[in-house]
């Protein structure tokens, strides 16, 4: 077995890219290290960076399609091989890169027979397509396909509300996440007193892993800057205030709860994004308000299978992670 060797700084905290690869235009990979870190620091940074990479970076997606030929999402159009639903799913997969703020319009206008691909989308100059070969539809007859598109830049994901089809326009569930997956690992040295943080990043091509690392770091810094101010700022918020009611709370109440149920609190403090779940499973759980290990254990395998877009393979993967990392299991049914 050949062990990998890397050169790290002995004093100054430094980062560098130790590996990069392009599997395709829509799948880029990068591996980075940060060192030297004191014991415990690598995990602190790694968890925060993974969450920022998956949830804090903006992406550009097609969010709505409009055509007079669409009667409903699962209809078919004479002369087009794919159903409307399949066309919408193909549009959802188009990877875009932009300097867009908010939303803009685009369109498709093609006459068959022939294949409709991403290169047939007419875009504003500040939006570009990463892979022009991405398939949209197959026209089998000499018909004209005209589709109006709405493009949006945002972060995270959006779920369309039911029954939102109107005037030949249909929303597309966008996933504004340029980072497909992110993992972190830790290598200890000097008798466990020093650590090297390894970050692995996979992107959809709209950002390179290095660009994603920069964006995530900048967003984290922006969130923490207010804490660097030595005094609380009394901003003039007249006309822009919102009162949030809070439940009664004392230190002793909190201490009593911690003492009473230490195991429950421990499970509640472990967030699901610390479990190296794939982004798709992670997002499905978040949509069902499952954020911690305690939330997850309050559900059975049967409950998970009732969630939208959840598959038996996803449940098996969760069971494997729970067994490997926490030596616990999910019941098949609620008792």
UniProtKB/Swiss-Prot annotation:
SMART domains: RPOLD
Spans annotated as Alpha N-terminal domain (alpha-NTD): 1-231
GO cellular component: chloroplast; DNA-directed RNA polymerase complex; mitochondrion
Listed name of the protein: DNA-directed RNA polymerase subunit alpha
Enzyme nomenclature, EC number: 2.7.7.6
UniProt KW GTP-binding keyword: no
Main location: plastid
Region of interest called Alpha C-terminal domain (alpha-CTD), as start-end residue ranges on this chain: 263-335
Domain notes: The N-terminal domain is essential for RNAP assembly and basal transcription, whereas the C-terminal domain is involved in interaction with transcriptional regulators and with upstream promoter elements.
Compartment(s) of residence: Plastid, Chloroplast
Gene3D superfamilies per UniProt: 5' to 3' exonuclease, C-terminal subdomain (1.10.150.20), DNA-directed RNA polymerase, insert domain (2.170.120.12), RNA polymerase, RBP11-like subunit (3.30.1360.10)
